[in-house]
């Protein structure tokens, strides 16, 4: 029997293939697939349940219903293999051929394929250059189309109605040819000469200038070329033969009660066959034209419904009023073939159960219930039982296991040893959602999980369930052990920090044991070592918190990596000395000699991993957990109501606030403040009161007064349980304690506005009904938000994975010198992220020099690890150019040096690592922690936004970058440049603070001067924008005519008069073309030139500008000539959280984007139109000026005559990433997206490495638009893969030809996913129909480069361990070796089979 199985296995040989091609099927091709024509709509005989002949389930066409048995029963058994029964015509073979044999239907009249007709843009329409409306009218028999005009005045493709057709017939007789229906379209398509048409269009393209026409022509050329190149014929878009799906893929299953469950496809096929047969009969009868026409139309509709039901007109419904599922519905959507069956298969050998805590487990173990283990490891147990001779057959083994005999349990123990299992918790948001453990058999029915891996799984023990999977093959077990074992996943791939970090109880226990306490029992002792400390504690002679001196032996690694001992007496506590016993050798004592909070413990594990490596860290983590649990239990920390201490001052603070509110109410009633001001002030008062209460409360909780040994009072950190939990980072936060013991504070209304009466009570006092009611809204909104957030975050992750899935590390070094400059992230006065955090684990792109010298500090191509980063910090390096995936030169994939360190492993990344997916998971996984809301800025926040000065925090020296300035009459610097930055440098040369300085700011200190901390270095008026003169002289008014271009206004309060320039809309007809300006002249009245140019100093004034000078006044440089009031933009909403991240990755244009200068040059304003200003930028080199129309209401940042650089901001607003890419380049757009995304995550306290965002940006920049084709095959304006252009240009340049020039494109992640070269990947993402239609017409080849395509075709993915397999396959292919599948010829096969059968099936037991 075994030989027989072996033989049958050898028959199915695996196909080796490198690519998959999709194309249109020609009628002959469809016939060649088919095993016979389906002529009847019948399915099976309702009495015998046998398939009807020539019907949809016909056994003659599709194969036998039972294995090796014909329908009438004449031939049975294996020996008649391949015989065709002469009675019923069925071939004797396996039933499974019914899954692969297709049939066909010969259509009596051609029908159009709806995908090529209706999937926009319509391929048939584009090819014929006819509107879709017209084609539809022809296809559905409403009008005629002219196919051949002959000698008449009718043109080809002209549409004729019934009457026009009859008139033409009368006039011309049979001179011309016009038809209707699909045959007409087919004739048109058939008679097209694609190549000639192509030539013609190319000529037209060269002649035309209009942009829209060009676009249309390129579209058509591309389609025609695709047809020519792929060998598809246009007329194949019209079906003359319809393939029929194999019957087992559209099953018909009898239910009990004589009814049938059937696939909808059978109904759809039946309609097609019925209508087709009726049409044949009508044609044979030569029925009247109108009847035949109607039948043809119905046939077209039936075929449409079969292919894609509901795409045209109403969907055909079944008996239960639900639309039938057509072929297109089978493959698209979440329930379609791609996502349901090809990418999401179910797994055999798996189980699931509830999880509970296993605090006694080691990190690499999990507790597995015996019942589950027995079921999961069945095949192994059967095998072992047979091997041992305890069971003769599988059946006997099965019986033994079912009876649960004693020997079975022993064998289970053996089988399980060293056999890892995979544990998975849904939702699997990142790769740490599946990890491998060694099972430990336990009683009960719940899986036990190690507490430290909960953070990675995001699991808790409130009823979560987890699934167990068994890796069956040896390779799978190896991979699980080497790569997926929980002990090998200590660092998070998102940020390279430990993810196996104790939380909650463990943190509390460690914090409690490392706290110190004044005058505790045993204070002042001197102990010989940690052992003695533990003995004293256990015997009750010393408290854990007692301050003692202990002799400690530390070990330090020397230069050779050997451990060197060093013993000293340390001031410490008993608890810390006890904890030292579990710390591995090689770490300094300082790391435990402090009160350990969560952050400190995380840092401790990180240090341990970096110094000592993986194994000691794992053991240490386990020991930390055991110790933490033990001492948390001993601490007895618990929460009682008295722990929530309400500050005495609370009452008084609240009554003060109430008094202030009453006062403002009075002011409002007497009309001194407006309603809006009153509201904002009230809210400010309450917010301040809340802060005071919570400060008083925290001060109260934080410290307690105790008597020390000398009898004096001393303050020490409190041992209040609630405070300890918050302080250690175990649970809770200051904000939560505030609600428990302070006051709840202000609440929001459903519309997002703040209710002005706060909740003054806290939870300890309890809320009254009104307060409770106000709180309900926020609570409910929180829950609703969470539900929305999960869905949105999941969808973002899906899009990210899809765009990045094919990015794999494919080579070691691409050799590029490109890279991005990394500087610390500084916002205002604080360093948000120091340089070391940003460059750690990256590779330098250029030599890093010692500041101020030419000495090389770090050579190029160095992977910066911790020690290098220390060196950079010591030498206070401020900027490092590092390699980045965005600038990597590898064609498909990236190189290891551009990526840098593998964050989860701590060394340079390996080849074959799937960095795209890791990046997508790292960005998507914290998505659920981001907020969903848009922030309304109102009240206190909006007033703070109008800053008017810069006050530095630290002392140091000032450094100004991209600055133009003049000195005013009082000797201060006045800034006249737009994007000036002011940085504060400390004495080591490090940047500490960074500020933007606006135009017109007055600086108190100049470049390079020293400042003290807290000094104000710059100030300006936030409400107006000044016009600063750069020269001294006398003011001369030009075109400033009272009543025409200006008007005089007098301020009521001060009595000063000023001139206001009128807006062009307010001027009289005479003043329309005048340009009011201030000219600076010298004493003789000659023009003064702007220094460094030959332009006269003349300042044009925009509308609404206020001038407070008189004609002829003497002024000096740096003085303000005029002021332009800035309209306050009102309260702007800031999109934050998840929607913001999605907007950035989708590269959406903001509503009113900033306007950037397209070229460098001098600004001037041309003729205005109604509502728009014409901005003209004239380049200095005299080339063509650039013009742009800008709406009047936009506030411009530039004056006439000012010089701007390409990419400078002309009008403020959110910048559009596309503009940044176009004007400032790839690095600028990368920096913009990375910084903006990081801002959102940083606000939530989530750390993500920049690399991951850069990986996604690289994928967004995959496409380029051809600007000039050169000698390449590309079309101008065509969008192509960037790597394709690079490869083509390299080849062209090697042959001495001109390459194509291109501009990079930024695509949103959805667009980029759909625009990938792999049609399989795109089709399984979204818009399946459109993608497949496009691919088929173009005859695309899918090279199966990405991960997704390979999963879909069922191969190992070309990443990780599969990467080597694919490399090897390619190498073997290149060497021309044959695939290793055994080849068997038909004769050999039948001979060996006969031999086997003759030997008898019973005789093989003796083996």
Curated annotation (Swiss-Prot):
Could you tell me what reaction this enzyme catalyses? RNA(n) + a ribonucleoside 5'-triphosphate = RNA(n+1) + diphosphate
Instruction: Name the source's superkingdom.
Output: Bacteria
Q: How is the cofactor bound?
A: Binds 1 Mg(2+) ion per subunit. Binds 2 Zn(2+) ions per subunit.
Annotated keywords: Acetylation, DNA-directed RNA polymerase, Magnesium, Metal-binding, Nucleotidyltransferase, Transcription, Transferase, Zinc
Which parts of the sequence carry N6-acetyllysine? Answer: 972
Which cofactors does the annotated protein need, by name? Mg(2+); Zn(2+)
Sites where the protein binds Mg(2+): 460, 462, 464
Swiss-Prot/TrEMBL GO biological process terms: DNA-templated transcription
Q: Where does Zn(2+) 2 bind?
A: 814, 888, 895, 898
| CC terms in the record's Gene Ontology section | DNA-directed RNA polymerase complex
* TM annotation in the entry: none
Answer whether the UniProt record assigns the keyword DNA repair to this protein: no
Query: GO terms for molecular function, please?
Result: DNA binding; DNA-directed RNA polymerase activity; magnesium ion binding; zinc ion binding
User: Top enzyme class of this protein?
Assistant: transferase
Q: Does the keyword Transcription apply?
A: yes
Q: What is its EC number?
A: 2.7.7.6
Q: Which residues bind Zn(2+) 1?
A: 70, 72, 85, 88
Q: What does this protein do?
A: DNA-dependent RNA polymerase catalyzes the transcription of DNA into RNA using the four ribonucleoside triphosphates as substrates.
Extract the PANTHER family matched here.
DNA-DIRECTED RNA POLYMERASE, DNA-DIRECTED RNA POLYMERASE SUBUNIT BETA
Question: What family, per the record?
Answer: Belongs to the RNA polymerase beta' chain family.
State the oligomer form and interacting partners: The RNAP catalytic core consists of 2 alpha, 1 beta, 1 beta' and 1 omega subunit. When a sigma factor is associated with the core the holoenzyme is formed, which can initiate transcription.
Question: What name is this protein filed under?
Answer: DNA-directed RNA polymerase subunit beta'
Q: Which organism is it from?
A: Escherichia coli (strain SMS-3-5 / SECEC)
Q: Which gene encodes it?
A: rpoC
